[in-house]
């Protein structure tokens, strides 16, 4: 039962389904469920180790960079997100509801604060120190995705903590090694360019 609850939380946060961005070819990713594991291992023949592996990002989870950036925005907003859209500019006209509807997963808001603090500390004194940018507080997390028989993928996800400078960023560099390397360096340059342009 706990596994299905966890899976439902992920679905509410935009994983396992298309987010609905206005770009062709969007992937839905994949979040396994009990039915999937019963098919792979046999009815109720999979163990808690399978659930633990999935919970820490190992195993069969597939997420798109856009879904990860959306998760970052959800953490920055402390529990809600907009469906991502591609826009050139937003003017003073009233936007249709599809652009302004907030999606709020049924997750205790206190958890977001704890995660945000962990991401802040990763930048202050952890693997993301390179993401620091002047007096603008940045929160982030590096990741290293293992690839069988090849070099790991390098990940970084982060966001600006300032409400007047909203930015969520994600970078995956395939077969580039640790997350604190290429992905963090590229993300840092993107964030600096955006934040300089906005201040």
Predicted regions located by residue number:
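Short, gly/Ser/Thr-rich active-site loops of penicillin-recognizing serine hydrolases
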Residues: 96-97, 101, 184-199
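Beta-lactam-recognizing serine transpeptidase/beta-lactamase-like catalytic domain environment
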Residues: 1-175, 179
